[in-house]
């Protein structure tokens, strides 16, 4: 989701929400709970004793069912740890800044820990040719605003995930094109 957090005649700054979305918290929690259940039942089948009273493993033979449940439980817990770390590190969060004073466009995002944790891409505002809007309807709809930049590939500005409504896409693209004084392509 893009929030227009700073608006003036000379600087436009849009905040971009990263991985700290409600849906990510939901899926990380569901995967952790489900994987924990699988792992507990798998271990219970090995021990021939119910570790948790409401998760009975009396009818489950350890080889192959309990072993497979342990494997899926372990894999699910690893996936859940990855999801929780992504949320903790807030991967994908950042901003798009369009600065007429200095003549710069700055696209900033937080990445995974390491030497490239801070993703900071800067372009000259004069290199922006247009704002391109891509709209694909169907089973997997896609609605993205791109910054068309001279000499490089188009830079996506909208978030990944739940697509924005047509009205929101049009309003954001129009506001950005008006600010940058460039054309809109694709609408």
UniProtKB/Swiss-Prot annotation:
Compartments, as annotated in UniProt:
Plastid, Chloroplast thylakoid membrane
Provide the gene name from the record. Answer: ycf4
What is the protein's name according to its record?
Answer: Photosystem I assembly protein Ycf4
What's a GO cellular component annotated to this UniProt protein? photosystem I
Instruction: Give the residue spans that cross the bilayer.
Output: 25-47, 62-84
> From which source organism is this entry?
Mesostigma viride (Green alga)
- Membrane topology for this entry? Multi-pass membrane protein
Transmembrane as a keyword of this entry, yes or no, is: yes
Tell me the protein family, please: Belongs to the Ycf4 family.
Q: Which InterPro entries match?
A: PSI_Ycf4_assembly
Q: Name one GO biological process term.
A: photosynthesis
Keyword entries, A-Z: Chloroplast, Membrane, Photosynthesis, Plastid, Thylakoid, Transmembrane, Transmembrane helix
Cross-referenced NCBIfam families: PRK02542.1
Which coarse location class describes where this protein primarily resides? plastid
Which Pfam families does its entry note? Answer: Ycf4 (PF02392)
Going by the entry's taxonomy, the superkingdom of the source organism is recorded as: Eukaryota
Reported function = Seems to be required for the assembly of the photosystem I complex.
């Amino acid at each position: 989701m893009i929030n227009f957090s700073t608006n003036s005649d000379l600087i436009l700054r849009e905040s971009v929400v990263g991985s700290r979305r409600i849906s990510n918290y939901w899926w990380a929690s569901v995967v952790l709970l489900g994987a924990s259940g699988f792992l507990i039942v798998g271990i219970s089948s090995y021990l021939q004793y119910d570790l948790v009273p409401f998760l009975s493993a009396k009818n489950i033979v350890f080889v192959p069912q309990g072993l497979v449940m342990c494997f899926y439980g372990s894999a699910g817990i690893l996936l859940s740890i990855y999801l929780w770390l992504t949320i903790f590190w807030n991967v994908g969060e950042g901003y798009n800044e369009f600065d007429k004073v200095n003549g710069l466009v700055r696209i900033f995002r937080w990445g995974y820990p390491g030497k490239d944790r801070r993703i900071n891409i800067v372009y000259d505002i004069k290199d922006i040719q247009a704002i391109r809007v891509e709209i694909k309807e169907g089973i997997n709809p896609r609605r993205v605003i791109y910054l068309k930049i001279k000499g490089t590939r188009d830079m996506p500005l909208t978030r990944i995930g739940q697509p924005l409504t047509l009205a929101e896409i049009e309003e954001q693209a129009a506001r950005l094109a008006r600010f940058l004084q460039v054309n809109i392509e694709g609408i």
